[in-house]
């Protein structure tokens, strides 16, 4: 039973990488969204409002022009390795690998760390405002001040929280398995 739950948990964690994680909004209108894979690859999808502004142009500007989120990339590697070990454990029928909770914990910490430090698109927005020169007299040092002045919000979509929850499940299972009976 534990092997099945571990497999489902890691498969779900991999699936949540395809869903939108981060939504960058300006004046409460979605400008760019990024899924987990897009944060790793350095891409993004233009929001509805941005698509109307751009018109018929492809969103090539957001593909490959952003830096990759390295912590998320290593977290994705942990999820893929965990899924592989979960499949081996499921097919082998033996006890679950003790590496599964460690891989889940590592991916959980790395994705959480990336959320805390900010995604590369956030730094790119700050750099673009500094390059365009928001007036030299008004030097905006803090990112939160810039975002407040320009009405920019970074909204984490529910899929990123589901990702963290699915990675937390193997850790909980490991702690429950250690409990004396």
PLM region descriptions:
Residues 1-181:
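Compact integral membrane and secretory-pathway proteins
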């Amino acid at each position: 039973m534990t092997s099945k739950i571990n497999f489902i948990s890691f498969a779900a964690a991999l699936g949540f990488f395809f869903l939108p994680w981060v939504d960058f909004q300006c004046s409460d209108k979605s400008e760019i969204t990024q899924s987990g894979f897009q944060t790793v690859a350095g891409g993004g999808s233009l929001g509805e409002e941005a698509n109307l502004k751009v018109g018929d142009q492809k969103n090539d500007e957001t593909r490959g022009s952003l830096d990759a989120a390295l912590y998320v990339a290593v977290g994705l590697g942990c999820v893929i390795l965990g899924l592989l070990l979960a499949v081996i454990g499921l097919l082998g029928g033996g006890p679950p690998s003790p590496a599964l909770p460690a891989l889940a914990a590592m991916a959980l910490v790395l994705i959480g760390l990336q959320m805390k430090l900010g995604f590369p698109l956030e730094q790119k927005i700050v750099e673009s405002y500094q390059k365009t020169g928001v007036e030299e007299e008004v030097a905006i040092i803090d990112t939160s001040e810039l975002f407040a002045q320009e009405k920019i919000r970074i909204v984490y979509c529910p899929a990123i929280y589901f990702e963290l929850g699915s990675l937390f499940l193997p850790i909980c299972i490991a702690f429950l398995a250690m409990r004396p009976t």
